[in-house]
Amino acid sequence: MHERIGNNKKLKIECLRLTGMLNIDDIQFIREMAGCYYDTKGHKYDGHLRYLDISGATLTNTDNKEVSIYPRDPSEYEGTPWPSAEAYINDKGTPVAIFAYLYDMEEIVLPAKLKSIGDDAFIFCRSLKSINIPESVQKIGLSAFYFCI
């Protein structure tokens, strides 16, 4: 996905529909596009992605990578450690905290065959107005929608 969109456009796109296989690198790229990603040096991305449709996508894990999830503004947690979670992609559900802290994300369309939504998957998605939960979902994790409006 990174090669197709490129760094020039990734922070400008507001609506995105993806099909095919998505891996952890793609999810990390999506988080950058949505303006919610800090790397280990504290670099921040100012993306504008608000609408994400991954209904035709399959989440895959080919390399067991992990990603640390951090809030958009670390000053919110001044004096305390930033919350973080290990996120693993698999074909059964959304990993823990995979879309956490996407403060400006307004709509997400999940894969049609999704089986579960992980713990904290959408925590602090404060602008979320619409999300589909496919009939195939059998489990929704703890605090999956905590602090969502």
Predicted regions and their residues:
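Short, T/G/N/S-enriched strand-turn elements that build extracellular solenoid repeat scaffolds
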Residues: M1-K9, D25-G35, K41, L142-S143
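Short conserved micro-motifs at the rims of enzyme active sites and ligand-binding pockets
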Residues: R4, N64-K65
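Structural signature of tandem-repeat unit edges
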Residues: E14-L22, K41-N64, D73-D91, L102-S116, ...
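A structural signal for leucine-rich repeat
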Residues: I30-C36, E66-R72, I123
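A composition-driven surface/loop motif
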Residues: G93-P95
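Consensus positions within tandem repeat domains that build extended binding/scaffold surfaces
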Residues: A97, G118-I123, G141-Y146
